[in-house]
């Protein structure tokens, strides 16, 4: 009597993985609306979303603070994760992250300049100044990385990113020595947080990030070809220089918008692509949506834990992602960067 052999080690279908990620994201989003110094029942959360009562304290808490930080965490986590996946293809380095473009340092310097020169302006001006700094740093790294033969050299770009980061960090330290008043604001921003952001203030930046996410998904086919190798991509008639330029612009838009909204949040762009590769095939048409879902889930989870670790105070979400990411990064280094 013959027995059917059930194959082991079979991957779950990519569609099922993405569906599961969507369910997890929805569950974490609802939990994020519930959790805090004051816990809110699920029925109250649903009531606040569908029929908000301006006299109900729980409804006010959900709509005024928790909804905005939940949406920001979703967009920022997805943006950083997709930017990290693109960056690893762009540099052909499995340990690359969006920080290689000097985005964090550029955003920090421009923010310090804005706080020092215009301390009384609205927070939206600070956010846009940080986004501008991220864009300037990314453009400088790109220009230096394409010097010489006119094509992007991954090694030159990494070195340029380190140099630009060091330069902006030195400028930032000099500005803080001259002007101590902006130190508290900058330290809060450096720690990384999705709290105390009004939805109306960050909505334009969220729109840019969402548009860049759509652009990354549309470019996923070309990313696959480039990931196969420069020679193969050229042999297939692909304009690799244009693909790299578009990928770089998307990285700057995604990571720059995320940094401007939430500050410096590390490790999401590094560890999420590796997690996604363990669950999904090496096809960026599946991998990039998976990174977006996993990144959003990871940052939401980190933000939820940040609220309950030392109630009634909160731990900056950037600290929580560092606690998750640092051991994972050490693990990747021990594996020689060949994880996944």
Swiss-Prot record:
Keywords: Cell inner membrane, Cell membrane, Ion transport, Iron, Iron transport, Membrane, Transmembrane, Transmembrane helix, Transport. GO terms for biological process: achromobactin transport; chrysobactin biosynthetic process; siderophore-dependent iron import into cell. One of its GO terms (cellular component) is plasma membrane. The chain crosses the membrane at residues 21-41, 70-90, 98-118, 125-145, 158-178, 199-219, 251-271, 286-306, 313-333. Pfam families: FecCD. Its main location: membrane. It comes from the Bacteria. SUPFAM superfamilies: ABC transporter involved in vitamin B12 uptake, BtuC. It is found in: Cell inner membrane. The keyword Transport applies. One of its GO terms (molecular function) is transmembrane transporter activity. It is a multi-pass membrane protein. The keyword Ion transport applies. Part of the binding-protein-dependent transport system CbrABCD for uptake of the siderophore achromobactin. Probably responsible for the translocation of the substrate across the membrane. Belongs to the binding-protein-dependent transport system permease family. FecCD subfamily. This is Achromobactin transport system permease protein CbrB. It comes from Dickeya dadantii (strain 3937) (Erwinia chrysanthemi (strain 3937)).
